[in-house]
Amino acid sequence: MAQEGQDIPTFKCVLVGDGGTGKTTFVKRHMTGEFEKKYVATLGVEVHPLIFHTNRGAIRFNVWDTAGQEKFGGLRDGYYIQGQCAVIMFDVTSRVTYKNVPNWHRDLVRVCENIPIVLCGNKVDIKDRKVKAKSIVFHRKKNLQYYDISAKSNYNFEKPFLWLARKLVGDPNLEFVAMPALLPPEVKMDKDWQAQIERDLQEAQATALPDEDEEL
């Protein structure tokens, strides 16, 4: 199985969301990607090559991280151009970061059009959750995939990448055969809490969408 070179299928993955939602923490969990990251000075971004091993061979996501530029307004189109997939992240302890998800989605699809997108609610290890599962409906309206994640505990780290890999390769049965080397968890997910948030999410997904036509 190839480790280096251009023979690994490689996809540009754009990582967006408000500042402070944990995007950089998330992408830095993957140890080899952090070690091999490249800085693109013209755009002020870090590109992390995240390799995953699947039952069809290795796959690489070149994950573009904004390095905090989003705090100064929108991102330049060069960040999005040739993006083949995307992760939009918000912080479940901050309602405003979820309210801004439609803006990030709009910017993404304006440049990238019809690419697979995963919405991630980060920091679910924190019990003081402000954005409840039942409030998270944007992905259902726009046909995106959604995952609760906790970057600091590694909870569901691989899920967004597995979903994107299946879409990009066109194989719904694609599986990761080994987990990448991740940094040790900084926090532990409480097992009862984890079971609770998984139940809440299942219930929310089974609930009909509200009739009103508002974005959120």
Curated annotation (Swiss-Prot):
<keyword id="KW-0460">Magnesium</keyword>
<feature type="domain" description="Small GTPase Ran-type">
    <location>
        <begin position="7"/>
        <end position="171"/>
    </location>
</feature>
<dbReference type="InterPro" id="IPR002041">
    <property type="entry name" value="Ran_GTPase"/>
</dbReference>
<feature type="region of interest" description="Switch-II">
    <location>
        <begin position="68"/>
        <end position="84"/>
    </location>
</feature>
<feature type="binding site">
    <location>
        <begin position="150"/>
        <end position="152"/>
    </location>
    <ligand>
        <name>GTP</name>
    </ligand>
</feature>
<dbReference type="GO" id="GO:0043243">
    <property type="term" value="P:positive regulation of protein-containing complex disassembly"/>
</dbReference>
<feature type="binding site">
    <location>
        <begin position="18"/>
        <end position="25"/>
    </location>
    <ligand>
        <name>GTP</name>
    </ligand>
</feature>
<dbReference type="GO" id="GO:0000054">
    <property type="term" value="P:ribosomal subunit export from nucleus"/>
</dbReference>
<feature type="binding site">
    <location>
        <begin position="122"/>
        <end position="125"/>
    </location>
    <ligand>
        <name>GTP</name>
    </ligand>
</feature>
<comment type="similarity">
    <text>Belongs to the small GTPase superfamily. Ran family.</text>
</comment>
<dbReference type="GO" id="GO:0046872">
    <property type="term" value="F:metal ion binding"/>
</dbReference>
<dbReference type="GO" id="GO:0000132">
    <property type="term" value="P:establishment of mitotic spindle orientation"/>
</dbReference>
<comment type="subunit">
    <text>Found in a nuclear export complex with RanGTP, exportin and pre-miRNA. Interacts with tamo.</text>
</comment>
<dbReference type="GO" id="GO:0051168">
    <property type="term" value="P:nuclear export"/>
</dbReference>
<dbReference type="InterPro" id="IPR001806">
    <property type="entry name" value="Small_GTPase"/>
</dbReference>
<feature type="site" description="Essential for GTP hydrolysis">
    <location>
        <position position="69"/>
    </location>
</feature>
<dbReference type="GO" id="GO:1990498">
    <property type="term" value="C:mitotic spindle microtubule"/>
</dbReference>
<keyword id="KW-0498">Mitosis</keyword>
<dbReference type="GO" id="GO:0007346">
    <property type="term" value="P:regulation of mitotic cell cycle"/>
</dbReference>
<dbReference type="GO" id="GO:0005737">
    <property type="term" value="C:cytoplasm"/>
</dbReference>
<dbReference type="GO" id="GO:0000212">
    <property type="term" value="P:meiotic spindle organization"/>
</dbReference>
<keyword id="KW-0813">Transport</keyword>
<dbReference type="GO" id="GO:0003924">
    <property type="term" value="F:GTPase activity"/>
</dbReference>
<keyword id="KW-0653">Protein transport</keyword>
<dbReference type="GO" id="GO:0005525">
    <property type="term" value="F:GTP binding"/>
</dbReference>
<comment type="function">
    <text>GTPase involved in nucleocytoplasmic transport, participating both to the import and the export from the nucleus of proteins and RNAs. Switches between a cytoplasmic GDP- and a nuclear GTP-bound state by nucleotide exchange and GTP hydrolysis. Nuclear import receptors such as importin beta bind their substrates only in the absence of GTP-bound RAN and release them upon direct interaction with GTP-bound RAN, while export receptors behave in the opposite way.</text>
</comment>
<keyword id="KW-0479">Metal-binding</keyword>
<keyword id="KW-0547">Nucleotide-binding</keyword>
<dbReference type="InterPro" id="IPR005225">
    <property type="entry name" value="Small_GTP-bd"/>
</dbReference>
<keyword id="KW-0206">Cytoskeleton</keyword>
<keyword id="KW-0132">Cell division</keyword>
<dbReference type="GO" id="GO:0005635">
    <property type="term" value="C:nuclear envelope"/>
</dbReference>
<dbReference type="GO" id="GO:0006606">
    <property type="term" value="P:protein import into nucleus"/>
</dbReference>
<keyword id="KW-0131">Cell cycle</keyword>
<dbReference type="GO" id="GO:0042564">
    <property type="term" value="C:NLS-dependent protein nuclear import complex"/>
</dbReference>
<feature type="binding site">
    <location>
        <position position="68"/>
    </location>
    <ligand>
        <name>GTP</name>
    </ligand>
</feature>
<dbReference type="GO" id="GO:0005634">
    <property type="term" value="C:nucleus"/>
</dbReference>
<dbReference type="GO" id="GO:0051292">
    <property type="term" value="P:nuclear pore complex assembly"/>
</dbReference>
<keyword id="KW-0342">GTP-binding</keyword>
<dbReference type="GO" id="GO:0006611">
    <property type="term" value="P:protein export from nucleus"/>
</dbReference>
<dbReference type="Pfam" id="PF00071">
    <property type="entry name" value="Ras"/>
</dbReference>
<feature type="binding site">
    <location>
        <begin position="36"/>
        <end position="42"/>
    </location>
    <ligand>
        <name>GTP</name>
    </ligand>
</feature>
